[in-house]
């Protein structure tokens, strides 16, 4: 019996050595002129982690200034807009935080190569009468009459979470001069409300019925959530209010996007919403943190059929500090959707100073 087994093993070994090896080839997918849809896996699937946004270069596209400049240590992408074939970035620059900040203008024909438009800021914190410490550009529009609008938020305390409100400034051209409205356009909620301490980081889009603003809001705990407001003229705003909630912290208004469940990567904060209305619905890129201290931040993706009810992507997080070489943190970001390409402009923190990097993804984002 033992001899039979040994003979069988010898035959198998000889067969394996003399059989031709199977060659594995990979055939590239056929080229297509249609945009590739980025789809969400089902709740029961376990997809491999994919890189949604790809950094176009390890180097920043917009650096901070020299040691003696107004933006010598920090710069972020502030408000970014694509208009008449040109990219405009109203970037924030500052030397410390929290400290006075200024807004500079850079432009680009393609989103990749940027040119500074003058050495000096075009809009300053001192131009906003009610800004106590700092003012940060956050969103921009070009109105039907050709006027330009920047929506900004203030930082009014050296403590955390500092009080902040949302304001608006206008100009006849992107270079200014910029004139801030005398009063904020979106104020804090009443004491005890979810946004009683901060309203900040607005993103405003124009729709067929008017304007929609998504913004971050926080109470004294500092835990930020995402709210929504609507307007017919871009000046007077009404916060979204779910009539089913009648007690604080949701008596006056309600967030449309809450923090993630305990233990999730975005369980601490969800903020800095960047929202787009597409043919298939609404898309939001947002920043999340694991705890209320703002640690372990990353960017997430969510979609909605109506701009109010949102579903997180199973691909989250879609961008982290590790995606920028040597970056310890990612702070402020902005996103543009131009011709089926999402341009992600992100403030990367390397060696305790920040510069602006670019990552992109192409194709439709669908539920």
Model-found features: residue ranges?
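Ser/Thr/Pro/Gly-rich low-complexity linker/stalk segments immediately outside membranes or between
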Residues: 24-31
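Positively charged n-region of N-terminal signal peptides that target proteins for export
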Residues: 1-5
């Amino acid at each position: 019996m033992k001899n039979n087994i040994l003979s069988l093993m010898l035959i198998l070994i000889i067969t394996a050595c003399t059989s031709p090896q199977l060659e594995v080839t990979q055939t590239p997918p056929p080229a297509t002129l249609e945009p590739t849809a980025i789809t969400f896996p089902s709740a029961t699937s376990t997809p491999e982690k994919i890189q949604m946004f790809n950094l176009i270069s390890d180097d920043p596209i917009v650096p901070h200034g020299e040691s003696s400049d107004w933006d010598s240590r920090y710069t972020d992408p502030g408000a970014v807009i694509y208009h008449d074939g040109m990219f405009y970035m109203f970037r924030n620059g500052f030397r410390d935080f929290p400290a006075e900040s200024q807004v500079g203008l850079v432009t680009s024909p393609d989103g990749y190569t940027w040119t500074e438009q003058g050495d000096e800021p075009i809009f300053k914190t001192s131009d906003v009468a009610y800004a106590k410490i700092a003012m940060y550009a956050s969103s921009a529009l070009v109105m039907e009459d050709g006027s330009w609008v920047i929506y900004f938020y203030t930082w009014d305390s050296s403590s955390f979470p500092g009080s902040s409100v949302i304001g608006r400034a206008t100009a006849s051209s992107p270079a200014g001069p910029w004139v801030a409205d005398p009063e904020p356009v979106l104020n804090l909620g009443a004491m005890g409300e979810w946004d009683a301490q901060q309203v900040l980081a607005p993103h405003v889009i124009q729709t067929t019925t008017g304007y929609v603003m998504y913004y971050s809001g926080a109470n004294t705990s500092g835990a930020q959530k995402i709210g929504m407001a609507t307007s017919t003229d871009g000046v007077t705003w009404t916060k979204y209010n779910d009539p089913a909630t009648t007690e604080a912290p949701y008596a006056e208004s309600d967030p449309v996007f809450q923090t993630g469940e305990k233990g999730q990567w975005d369980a601490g904060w969800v903020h800095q919403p960047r929202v787009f209305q597409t043919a298939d619905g609404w898309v939001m890129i947002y920043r999340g943190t694991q705890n209320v201290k703002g640690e372990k931040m990353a960017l997430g993706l969510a979609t909605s059929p109506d701009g109010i009810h949102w579903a997180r992507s199973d691909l989250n997080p879609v961008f982290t500090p590790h995606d920028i070489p040597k970056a310890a943190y990612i702070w402020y970001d902005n996103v543009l959707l131009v011709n089926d390409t999402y341009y992600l402009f992100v403030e990367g923190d390397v060696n305790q100073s920040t510069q602006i990097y670019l990552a992109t993804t192409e194709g439709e984002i669908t539920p």
